[in-house]
Amino acid sequence: MNEQKTNDLILQTATKLVSFIILLFSFYLFLSGHNAPGGGFVGGLITSSSIVLLLLAYDLKTVRSLLPVNFIYVAGAGLLLAVLTGVGSFVFGAPFLTHTFGYFQLPILGKTELATATIFDLGVYLVVVGITMTIIQTIGEEE
């Protein structure tokens, strides 16, 4: 039986643009998460959905060449970052996962709030992206 080669030029071209927009939205949700709905979990899921869109438009081999990352290591790094953020409060004699924040004057952004909760959210973000992509790639692999 001959396999018919499909022409997915429109899907692949649209995916490049849409994936970028989805990643920007994911970044926005990640940064607004401590003041509004969003954060590391939702941002990570949306980032994973962007990568899944790439997997649908292209194939697993192409996406792996674009993102040569072992996602299980991404999840491990995120878990380590989240735990270290929580343990870091012990250094200051505070309970586990006690967070603090401060306002800093940054060159282009002006007065900006920087919080340790953002570092914890980054850990959650990495764990969610790592685990969801590991599961999806494992399911999508050929035997």
From Swiss-Prot:
Localization of this protein: Cell membrane
Broad class of where this protein is predominantly found: membrane
Bilayer-spanning residue ranges: 9-31, 36-58, 71-93, 117-139
Membrane topology: Multi-pass membrane protein
rRNA-binding keyword on record: no
InterPro entries: CPA3_antiporter_subunitB (IPR050622), CPA3_sub_B (IPR005281), MnhB (IPR007182)
GO molecular function annotation: antiporter activity; monoatomic cation transmembrane transporter activity
GO BP: any one term: sodium ion transport
Superkingdom, natural source: Bacteria
Keywords (A to Z) from UniProt: Antiport, Cell membrane, Hydrogen ion transport, Ion transport, Membrane, Sodium, Sodium transport, Transmembrane, Transmembrane helix, Transport
Single GO cellular component term: plasma membrane
Family indicated by similarity: Belongs to the CPA3 antiporters (TC 2.A.63) subunit B family.
NCBIfam families (UniProt xref): 2a6301s02 (TIGR00943), PRK12573.1 (NF009223)
Function: Mrp complex is a Na(+)/H(+) antiporter that is considered to be the major Na(+) excretion system in B.subtilis. Has a major role in Na(+) resistance and a minor role in Na(+)- and K(+)-dependent pH homeostasis as compared to TetB. MrpA may be the actual Na(+)/H(+) antiporter, although the six other Mrp proteins are all required for Na(+)/H(+) antiport activity and Na(+) resistance. MrpA is required for initiation of sporulation when external Na(+) concentration increases. Also transports Li(+) but not K(+), Ca(2+) or Mg(2+).
Remarks, miscellaneous: Mrp-dependent antiport apparently occurs by a secondary, proton motive force-dependent mechanism, but the similarity of several Mrp proteins to membrane-embedded subunits of energy-coupled NADH dehydrogenase complexes raises the possibility that there is a capacity for electron transport that could provide a primary energy coupling option for Mrp functions.
Subunit text: Forms a heterooligomeric complex that consists of seven subunits: MrpA, MrpB, MrpC, MrpD, MrpE, MrpF and MrpG.
Protein name: Na(+)/H(+) antiporter subunit B
Organism: Bacillus subtilis (strain 168)
Taxonomic classification: Bacteria, Bacillati, Bacillota, Bacilli, Bacillales
